[in-house]
A protein has these predicted regions:
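Long, low-hydrophobicity, acidic/polar, solvent-exposed interaction domains
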Residues: 4-246
C-alpha cells in the first residue's frame, strides 16, 4: 500500500513518500485499522468484504473514521448531536468495534513527553540529534495545542489506520473519481462538523481564511487540531491485472 495525505479540494493529488530503507521494520496494520474498498471491472464495489452501492460509501467511510472501539465520536452542532446515532458494527465474539480503536491523547501524558524531549534536546551533542529531538518535540507541542483548542483530552486514530482503495485495470475512470470523491467527502464533512462546533466555521472556511492570511498562527492551529482528529489517509493498491469480479 502507498499511503498519501490529501488536504486539497482542487482535484485528486498524490505525493508519494520516499522508499522505506531496507533495515527499517514496517509494522503491519491490523485488519480492523484498514477500511478496504475494491472496485471491479463492472464498476461494482466491495467494501469491507461485502457489496455496497456507491451512494452508501460516504456514510460507511464515516463510520470507519468515527469508530472509537468503545463508542462514537460525537460533536454537538447547534441543537443536534452529530454522530450519536450512527451505526457501528461490533464483533460478536470480542465485543469490540470492527473498526479502529481510537487512542487517548491526554494532557498529562503530553506534558510529560514535552518535558522529556526538552531534556533530550538540551543534552543533545550533535546537530542530527538536535534536529530529530526538535521534530518530535514539535509534534508533542502540536498535540498540546490541539488539546487546548478542543477543550480537553481527545482520541486519535492509530497511525496504521487508513482507507485502502483498489480498482481493476478495467474500472472506468468516472467510477474511480466517484469513489475518490465519496471518500474525500466523508473526511471533509466530519472535519466541517468538528470545526463548526469548536471554532464556529467549517473546515473549508478555515482553510480559505488561512490561504488569505498565511501568517495567522491561530488559524493554522485550528486547522491542525481538526486534522488531528480526522486525518485523511487514503492509500491505493496496485490495480488488479485483467478483468475480475473482485
Amino acid at each position: 500500500l502507498v499511503t498519501t495525505t490529501i488536504d486539497s479540494d482542487e482535484g485528486i493529488k498524490r505525493q508519494l513518500p520516499p522508499p522505506v530503507p531496507p533495515d527499517i521494520d514496517v509494522p503491519q496494520a491490523k485488519e480492523q485499522n484498514v477500511f478496504n474498498v475494491k472496485v471491479n471491472f463492472l464498476d461494482q464495489l466491495l467494501v469491507e468484504g461485502g457489496p455496497l452501492d456507491i451512494e452508501d460509501l460516504k456514510n460507511s467511510a464515516k463510520s470507519f473514521l468515527i469508530a472509537t472501539g468503545d463508542g462514537i465520536m460525537s460533536h454537538p452542532v447547534g441543537r443536534d448531536v452529530v454522530g450519536r446515532n450512527r451505526e457501528i458494527e461490533i464483533d460478536s465474539e470480542t465485543g469490540n468495534a470492527k473498526f479502529p480503536e481510537r487512542l487517548w491523547v491526554r494532557k498529562a501524558d503530553v506534558k510529560m513527553r514535552i518535558a522529556e524531549y526538552e531534556a533530550f534536546l538540551a543534552a543533545a551533542d550533535t546537530e542530527n540529534k538536535k534536529k530529530n529531538y526538535t521534530k518530535v518535540l514539535d509534534s508533542w507541542k502540536e498535540k498540546l495545542t490541539t488539546i487546548e483548542l478542543l477543550g480537553g483530552d481527545y482520541k486519535e486514530l492509530p497511525s496504521s489506520a487508513l482507507i485502502s482503495m483498489q480498482n481493476d485495470n478495467n474500472t472506468t475512470y468516472n467510477t474511480y473519481l466517484q469513489v475518490q470523491n465519496e471518500l474525500q467527502t466523508a473526511v471533509n464533512e466530519l472535519r466541517d462538523e468538528l470545526a463548526l462546533e469548536k471554532f464556529g466555521r467549517t473546515y473549508k472556511e478555515l482553510e480559505d481564511l488561512y490561504d488569505r492570511n498565511a501568517d495567522d498562527i491561530d488559524l493554522l492551529n485550528q486547522i491542525t487540531a481538526v486534522r488531528s482528529v480526522y486525518p485523511q489517509r487514503i492509500s491505493e493498491a496496485e490495480p488488479r491485472e485483467g478483468s475480475s469480479y473482485y
